[in-house]
Amino acid sequence: MSKLFESRLADVIRKPVITEKATNALDLNQYTFEVDHRAAKPQIKAAIEALFNVKVIGINTMNPPRRTRRVGKFSGKRSQVKKAIVRLAEGDKIQLFPES
């Protein structure tokens, strides 16, 4: 892959989601990431495989509605968030936490 293509793939993945449900899914070899809301499943798969050198078996995505926030009398919307649950091949792992 070219460096330009890899740098664009790095922008697809924003951060890992660390919740109790996502941590329990690690036992099933499923990792949850917050991704760009415009990213499609093939782009997410290519980004995960290129950045972490793993084989992706399946991807589930969810695009929940934006939440409304108020500050005083002003009302606004929070930024759009898309989550991707990525299932990896048997034997592949992503190092999310440093080992101690």
Curated annotation (Swiss-Prot):
Pfam families xrefs: Ribosomal_L23 (PF00276)
Presence of keyword RNA-binding: yes
UniProt GO cellular component terms: ribonucleoprotein complex; ribosome
GO molecular function: rRNA binding; structural constituent of ribosome
Highest taxon of source: Bacteria
GO biological process: translation
Keywords: Ribonucleoprotein, Ribosomal protein, RNA-binding, rRNA-binding
Function description: One of the early assembly proteins it binds 23S rRNA. One of the proteins that surrounds the polypeptide exit tunnel on the outside of the ribosome. Forms the main docking site for trigger factor binding to the ribosome.
Subunit note: Part of the 50S ribosomal subunit. Contacts protein L29, and trigger factor when it is bound to the ribosome.
PANTHER family recorded: 60S RIBOSOMAL PROTEIN L23A
Entry similarity comment: Belongs to the universal ribosomal protein uL23 family.
UniProt name for this protein: Large ribosomal subunit protein uL23
Organism: Prochlorococcus marinus (strain MIT 9515)
